[in-house]
Amino acid sequence: MAPRSSKGKSNNKGKGGDKKKRDDKLLAPSLVEITVTTPYETQVILKGVSTDKIIDVRRLLASHVETCHFTNYSLSHKVKGHKLNDNIQVLSLKPCFLRMIPEEYLEESQALTQVRRVIDIVACTTRFFSKSPNKSIVAGNANPTPAPDGLDMVAIHTTPKLSQFYEFFSIHHLSPPILHLKKVDGEEAGEKRDGDYFGLKVKICNGKVIHVIASVKGFFAVGKQLSHCHSIVDLLQNVSNAFAKAYESLMKAFTDRNKFGNLPFGLRSNTWLVPSPVSESASPLPTEDEHWGGNGGGQGRNGEYDHRPWAAEFSVLATLPCKTEEERVIRDKKAFLLHSQFIDTSVQRAVRAICNVMDTNQQTSGTTDLPAGSILLEDHVGDLSIVVKRDIASLDSKPEATFQNDAFVLSSEELAERNLLKGITADESVIVHDTPALGKVIVRQCGYTAVVNVKGQTQKAMSDFRDILIDDLPDGGANALNLNSLRVEFHRPHSVGTSVENQPTQLDWDDLESYRCIIQELVKINLTKLEETRVSSVRPIRWELGSTWVQHLQKKETDVCGKPATNDETELSVKGLGKQFKDLKSKSKKSENISAVNEKDTRLHELNEEDDLGQKSIDGLFTELKELLSEEAFSRLKETGTGLHLKSKEELTNMAYGYYDEIALPRLVADFGSLELSPVDGRTLTDFMHIRGLQMRSLGHVAKLAEKLPHIQSLCIHEMITRAFKHLLRAVIASVNNMAELPVAVAASLNFMLGRRELEGCDRIPGEEYCLRLQWLQKFLSRKFGWIQKDEFHHLKKFSILRGLCQKVGLELVSRDFDFDSPNPFMSSDIIGLVPVCKHVLCISSDGRTLLESSKLALDKGKLDDAVSYGTKALVKMIAVCGPYHRNTACAYSLLAVVLYHTGDFNQATIYQQKALDINERELGLDHPDTMKSYGDLSVFYYRLQHFELALKYVNRALFLLHFTCGLSHPNTAATYINVAMMEKEVGNDHLALRYLHEALKSNKRLLGADHIQTAASYHAIAVALSFMEAHSLSVQHEQTTLQILTAKLGADDLRTQDAAAWLEYFESRAIEQQEAGRNGIPKPDASIASKGHLSVSDLLDYISSDPDTKGNVAHRKHRRARILQVNDKVASADDDAHRVASQIDIVTWNNVAEADVTKSRSEVNDPDTVVDKTNIETGDIVVHRLNVDRQTVEESTLDEGWQEAYSKGRSGNGAGRKSRQRQPDLMKKRMLLNKHHNRNQDVQQQNIYSPLQKTSKGPSLSKSSPRRALKNAEIDVSTNTTKPQLKASGAAAVTSTTLASKSLSYKEVALAPPGTVLKPMLEKLELNLERTETQIYRTSSASSGEESKSDTVMLDLPIEGTELHCEKQESQESAESVENLTSESEGDLGSYRGKKTSDISRTKLSASAEPYNPGGFLVIDLQSSAATIGSYPIMVADPISWAVVSCGIHSPPYYSAIHSNGVGTPRSMNPDAPEFVPRRSLQNSSQHAGEDASVSVDSSSCLKAEKDAVDLKKRELASFIVKSSQKEVPAALSKTSPEAESGGTSEKDSAVTEIVYSREEENGANANETNGGEGFVIVAKKRRRKNKVRLTNVAAGLYHQPSSVCA
């Protein structure tokens, strides 16, 4: 339930309510355009959001290529003045024009920051790519043993390698502008003048060395007659042209990598993998290089907070007022800042203490005589007590009891009871009020454990403190303490001051084998102990269990009390008290019952006696719990209404255990099954369990319950084995006394755990080591987790285990490929260092986290207004408490991005998600689950903005990381496959897209079951893909399966079920039309296709593309709509209505030609203001009128960076909008009735008119809400040579568009919008556009005879500039040689079509030779855009899963998210300069036909030329395609086959499609690689090929969500 906001509290309810509404309205985010004037007097336009402050503007400038090198400057505003404070809201700056003012370097550190920034910018050219060959022993065999029974999906993409981990950030193909930079002082720096700080020797790209001096006024070159330059970049550009060109190339590479930001600098070493160049060099990454003023982040690095009165301030913290939300925000901020400062200080103090002990032990060898677990150091610094102990060199249970406060040592039973009472009485302040837990930190490193506690005077000191004064975190919370910066490095002197000797780079095999023997002995000893020890009967309890238990009981009571009253109503008040108090009733209730029924007198008397006895017992219980709890805590427990305050400690403990076993664990597995939770690694699994109070020792139980969920069971098994190996590795590290031998010991341990020594000798019998390892694992997992291991070890994902092991122990490895099939995959040189592993409580805003959960819940229910409101409030709270760039705030950015994505604000969604990604990469880690989620989400948002190649880059990065976490056998990976398929299709890789979809379906069936709703989503995706290939019968079969699953799982009344029913109805209509077309003489694919056996996808596409049309007036009438929809499928842009009300005779060929013309002209016309007058195209009997609509009337101007203007109004309508997705097929049909002169924005808005957002009825009515009936009526009129239906549709469009423009768009309408389209009702512009637009329909009689004598010619309206329609002549009865003559036809040959039969006009299907389609102005209905929600990862928008909400992150289920692409068409506005949208061949081809005759009169000569070039290009490509496909696929007898004989080809075609879709992926992939798209295809600009086709899947499906980000 959403928390109530206290801001609206008032004695006057009306005023309070109005205030709340105003607050909500103000909180609604919106796009903000910020113009900044640079020191070069140029203007930079930044895309921000309304929640931004000046500090966000600085971050945006740091991510812009023109200003990224500036560090020391201030911002000024003509109204607000100079040196604006970082906390000033951007919305308060009106006008939003800022100016950068360079400031003097008043301190040397500021000059060092400038140098560090420049080094950081150029680091991507050298620091993330190693030129040395890979050190992998057998790099080609680095793949683990495949899982049994094909549990993993087929790796369609290239198998990722660890050595490629940092290539995503590398720009190594460019020469670095700076080869070397050295700081010089003293005599080498030359004469030092007043104001000079230090000298620099800069070796630039051409080898020249430039001597630079840093001073207060800036930088200047020695010996050059130049004034000071504010930045080094400016100075070097002035001095050297070579540097200027190299730097310009680097900035261009940044833009090509991602024009919207996310520049690859500022990264930190925060991942378990270290770049090879960094591991080989002597300096860390520039951000953390202390030589240039960098550091590992955090506070108190110099000990400035060591003597802070921690005890007193933590005590004061617990007393701060926290009754209202405003009070809690103030309290939470102080608690967060104080605790963050305490954690940073304590961790650094603990690491320093451990290093001191290590140095002492290395000099004296003192640890050899000390017993294990003895205290080696005890120190007090102010209120901090630091105790360092040596870890026990055995595999005994971990001494987690040390985490409790030493002031009062509790037994296991007492600790469990204490935690349970803490949980059942928990409120928003539970963390802050637990001062002992808040003031404790445990740090492990190199076999030592340091415990830091706060011990000091509290009561006496509290009198001196009334409040806590503490500064905000620097840099908005960015640059938090990076634990990896505190590493102990093994191969060179490390930063923390220990004296570890340098380790030789060559592996000492003798030492490796000696340590391997030690490890084996250690395992044997532990194996014996495991046989002797017994499992403890005391079960620990986490306090979170009590909190979730109370919530469960409260929900249960609410559900029961919500039912109709019964005779037992009086017993409901004591529900949940257990059997002992089951019959207790209040005396007032009993007196009423006595007077009601005399027959119950005896029973009531007994109840009175029981009441007396019970009351005495209750009084005793009251006394017991009151003694244990404070009065406030006891009151809270009593007010919960659960009756737990009546229980004793023992009863509470037993009931909690019952809840744990019978409800909590099964519910967790149920959430896993429904994909409400979808963990991808051990970290997210641990977070999910801990947040629910579940112990990790229950992993074995979870694995048993998840027997039908292979991915969850596998994840549990991997986590259990990882934890077992963790204990073994810690024991080995603790047994090493000589730190120089530690790398060898670690490498030997990893080889023992992950190396392969299964078979030995000629008989290939299992080796001794293998048997010992397996036996120990089985026994350890059985005792520790209750899991009986079988043969899982043979099929482990060793990469996942290695990753988890490094994170749990603190290992840093070099990023290279490890051969796990060898006995020794690791060398000592692979072990870079050990980083500290910390354990402490998390202190964040509980209200903020509650708001995040409320936002996710509202999103799941389709209440977008509430989701936006809660998400924005959560973000505001997180920023207020943690700062805008703290790692805790990133999850709020990410969730709000997903919510805004669902509302259609793709630009805002992208901005917020980029913020989240930048934070996650730098603060959490490059492979953190939240970082993976951001990659997946951002790829979907880029996809919606029509940047398909950029989207592919980021989705492939998410897929790369998923490979090393959960592997291919996971629903999130399957959902990502669906996203990849969607994006691959947009760049022309249809065959690859189908393979991804096929693997996703198989994976979901295997992992989730054939009846899971996510499997239904995959079936739907395949159905849509088959529909693209006109295998409509198969589409019906797949959609029937989808409907059956959803009906069984969700019921017939669910919106998703009704949506599937509407889709099925659509597919059935297409199949019927196809059959009717066959019966009326229109040829279908050769029936012999079924006899060809397995075909590759490319063969299938070749074959389908070669199908010709034949005759039949009725057939044309029936087939017209199918072809129109096919065009829509292929283009997936904005409704090209001109192709729908087209002529029966020429519509098929004309549609294809028109698409090519539109593509070319749209890509060549960049001026949005261009208006082309109506053009007549006369070709004998055919008269076609085209009206070009001024795009400016509907579209906003295209922004420089490719962003579109977004409107917050598009987010309204969470109620009615919810229903729109159920009628997606009807929407498409209705939209075909619209006049074809509206652009796609108008069409999107017209959806409201033609789809009244009502549930799909089984029998469509004749009203406007039934598009199918309306379409059929229109078709009937066309068949009778009547143009009234078209005219009526035009009139309806004109009326309803105006009506719609004044309405707010709903949630589901946004889902139907094309990718990148921003939906904003614009009444005035629509009316203006409608006034300009006309539809003229001319009827002529065809000169053909026979059954084709009657044919209508219908005008085609194209909403684009400079586009002409042309007919292509093909004779289906002619041989392939005659078809080849098409290549010589010019544009003037259109007149030759006069008198031809319509049967002579053939069609092309899924033509791979089509010119790359520019998604500029059409709106084509997306066949799968009926639903609009993102899965929780969906897309790593978080848990990818279909309607099921994946917790913590983006919640859009994969069916709607992954399968139903919200976007069908092109965005309303795009950057025409975007590289991925520039056609590669259109210009060069157009020049070849400049001299051809034109048979069409055009008002504009430039328009004519563009149209001629496009038409001729299409004719040449079409002819080439038809010749190839006809020669290879179409039997010679096909031309002589009668229509009657061909009418039965549909089923054969569909069966053949089945063979193709489900077989021979390998052949398909090989063909694709050889022929670039399949045999028989004309190669076109691949990057832009058919970009506007319908999305196979919704963005949401690919999004992958990590709940941990929200539930941390």
Swiss-Prot record:
Gene that specifies this protein: REC3
One annotated GO biological process: chloroplast localization
GO cellular component terms listed in the entry, alphabetical order: cytosol; extracellular region; nucleus
Predominant localisation class: nucleus
Organism whose genome encodes this protein: Arabidopsis thaliana
Protein name (record): Protein REDUCED CHLOROPLAST COVERAGE 3
Disruption phenotype: Reduced proportion of the cellular volume devoted to chloroplasts leading to an abnormal chloroplasts distributions. Lower levels of chlorophyll, especially in plants lacking REC1, REC2, REC3 and FMT/CLU.
Annotated InterPro entries: CLU-central, CLU_dom, CLU_prot, TPR-like_helical_dom_sf, TPR_rpt
Motif (Nuclear localization signal): 1217-1224
Record flagged with keyword Repeat: yes
TPR repeats: 848-881, 890-923, 932-965, 974-1007
Biological function: May act as the scaffold of a protein complex, which sequesters key factors that are required for the G2 to M transition in meristematic tissues. Together with REC2, REC3 and FMT/CLU, contributes to the establishment of the cellular volume devoted to the chloroplast compartment.
Domain Clu, first and last residues per copy: 288-564
Biased composition (Basic residues): 1-12
Region described as Disordered: 1-22, 278-303, 1194-1226, 1238-1292, 1369-1400, 1466-1499, 1531-1552
Keyword annotations: Cytoplasm, Nucleus, Repeat, TPR repeat
Polar residues bias (residue ranges): 1242-1265, 1373-1385, 1535-1546
Presence of the UniProt keyword Phosphoprotein in the record: no
Stretches of the chain forming a coiled coil according to its record: none
UniProt subcellular location: Nucleus; Cytoplasm, Cytosol
CDD domains: CLU-central
GO MF terms, alphabetically ordered: mRNA binding
